[in-house]
Amino acid sequence: MLSFLVLVGLLAYLGLRPHQSWLLWLTAAIAGLGTDGIVRCHPAWHDRRAGASLLYFGLPALAVFGSGLFIHEALNGYSRPLAAIPPSLAIGLIAHAEYQTVDFTARRYGALRLGLAVAAYLSAFALYSMLMRPEVDVLFSAAAIMLVSGVLTLELLRENRLFGEGAILLAIAVGLSIAELRLVLYFFPLDSLLGGALLVIGFYLATGLVHHVLDHDLEWNTAAEYGVVAVAAAAAVIVTRLLV
């Protein structure tokens, strides 16, 4: 049902003329609140406070918002309605994964957390790319990227079972780091896709290092591996973008 509602919302946003931006905001809110409601139905969920499950709102809402903006800017014509199908189905899978991972002892916890991490990085790429467009004010872009990065970091930190003030402080730190990277990239002639890809690489590097710090297993060789992967990925992205 949630996937169907998201599909209807995305089709309305992408198909109606004149353009109605509020439809995307509404669809993102439905995805987030729907996931929140699904999580609260889990037998292991006992915290009945109003904002207790707010953590589960961020990823599905940002996934819908990012996919809608990306499709709107990247595609034209009849390909738009077809492109709305995969993200709509993905929201159903995200909601299912969020529900199952409420229980840290779930049999498929590791695989589902991996799927949620992939969804988080893809959502980050879609939103970063849209916020890197030349017509978007650089200060607004940096602020929005900080917010997006912080919210997605909170989702990723669930793997370390970190909640509360500690998680919020780490999310703010990661968000500020990626926002600073966005400001640095302003001085380079990058298109939005290349800029978005570089920001995702930075986001992956920051969140990966945070994971290892929280697990108390960050060593020099691990940090070096992340650095090599980040440099190699950035080089591959730049070369590919120049050749295409």
Language-model-derived ranges and their functions:
Residues A28-G32, L59, A63, A120, ...:
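Alpha-helical transmembrane segments in multi-pass membrane proteins
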Residues M1-A106, E219-A224, V231-V244:
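N-terminal topogenic module of multi-pass integral membrane proteins
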Residues M1, D47-P60, T101-A124, V138-A144, ...:
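Cytoplasm-facing juxtamembrane segments at the starts of transmembrane helices
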Residues P43-D47, V136, L190, H212-D215:
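Perimembrane helix-loop junctions in membrane proteins
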